[in-house]
Amino acid sequence: DYPKLTFTTS
């Protein structure tokens, strides 16, 4: 989840 996991910019 990009909105939640901002560090995980897949």
Curated annotation (Swiss-Prot):
Keywords: Apoptosis, Disulfide bond, Glycoprotein, Plant defense, Toxin
Entry PTM: Glycosylated.
Organism superkingdom: Eukaryota
Entry's Gene Ontology molecular function annotations: toxin activity
Biological-process GO terms, alphabetical: defense response
Quaternary data: Heterodimer of an A chain and a B chain; disulfide-linked.
Function of the protein: Significantly inhibits growth and induces an apoptotic response in HeLa cells through cell-cycle arrest at S-phase. Exhibits highly cytotoxic activities against cancer cell and non-cancer cell lines producing IC(50) values of 0.15 nM for human cervical carcinoma cells (HeLa), 7.71 nM for rat pheochromocytoma-12 cells (PC-12), 11.20 nM for human breast cancer cells (MCF-7), 15.80 nM for human leukemia cells (K562), 2.79 nM for African green monkey kidney cells (Vero) and 3.92 nM for normal Madin-Darby canine kidney cells (MDCK).
The protein, known as: Malanin chain A
Organism for this UniProt entry: Malania oleifera (Garlic-fruit tree)
